[in-house]
């Protein structure tokens, strides 16, 4: 198995070169673990001059020759399900996983409501909190939405009542600037000033160390993230305001499934 880390742009060429070299050796089994698919937010073109970089990055897997069939590529919390269709099906097969089970292991009844900051997060994550045996959701939900006022973008609560809860945790797949998370927290506390708000993202792809300081200044009770972006996770691993959820067990499980 090859662990592909793409949280630094300078590494992309080297990572694909190494993966291609390994595949060319025709091992008995071979798979690629790519926890972070970095161009996920550029998954579509809204204007004629937009460049869909997610599809461009995925096309690099054309360089990976099949190894006794298509090469499995494991991706954690992909931004949009349609992105798996960008990968060349004759070369690789995408296997999707999520960090939600790890996060739920951190939950207690005192965590309060699960907050979904936009429609995308609601579509991605709400189903993960549904218990089929009990035929109900495990937590109450608060849903937020983005709306524009001229050139400004605001976040407001569209479903649920923050006044009913002492605590809440915002869940999203990634953050670069923490802007949406902070605005969502502000929207909750505008309705209930006493609510304590935590946040979880699968991918903490911070664009700079200033984002870390911005998160701390915003006053989140706790900020959960995985180490799918290892360089950025290293920035906060010793900071008590953050808790890093290691993807080690998910990676091992993916490798074992690939050996079956």
Feature roles, as predicted:
Residues 1-260:
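PRPP-associated nucleotide enzymes
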């Amino acid at each position: 198995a090859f662990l592909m880390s793409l949280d630094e742009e300078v590494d992309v060429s080297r990572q694909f070169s190494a993966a291609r070299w390994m595949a060319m050796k025709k091992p008995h089994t071979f798979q690629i673990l790519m926890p972070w698919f970095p161009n996920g937010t550029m998954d579509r073109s809204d204007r004629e001059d937009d460049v869909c970089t997610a599809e461009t990055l995925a096309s690099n897997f054309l360089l990976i020759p099949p190894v006794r069939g298509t090469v499995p590529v494991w991706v954690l919390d992909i931004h949009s399900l349609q992105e798996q269709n960008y990968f060349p099906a004759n070369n690789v097969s995408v296997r999707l996983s999520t960090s939600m089970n790890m996060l739920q292991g951190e939950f207690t009844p005192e965590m309060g409501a699960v907050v979904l900051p936009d429609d995308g997060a609601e579509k991605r994550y709400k189903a993960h909190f549904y218990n089929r045996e009990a035929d109900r959701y495990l937590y109450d939900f608060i849903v937020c939405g983005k709306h524009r006022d001229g050139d400004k973008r605001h976040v407001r609560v569209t479903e649920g009542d923050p006044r009913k809860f002492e605590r809440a945790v915002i869940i999203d797949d990634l953050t670069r600037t923490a802007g949406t998370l902070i605005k969502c927290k502000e929207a909750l506390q505008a309705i209930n000033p006493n609510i304590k708000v935590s946040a979880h993202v699968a991918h903490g792809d911070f664009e700079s160390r200033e984002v870390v300081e911005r998160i701390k200044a915003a006053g989140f009770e706790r900020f959960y993230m995985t180490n799918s972006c290892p360089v950025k996770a290293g920035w906060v691993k010793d900071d008590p305001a953050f808790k890093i959820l290691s993807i080690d067990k998910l990676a091992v499980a993916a490798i074992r499934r690939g050996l079956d």
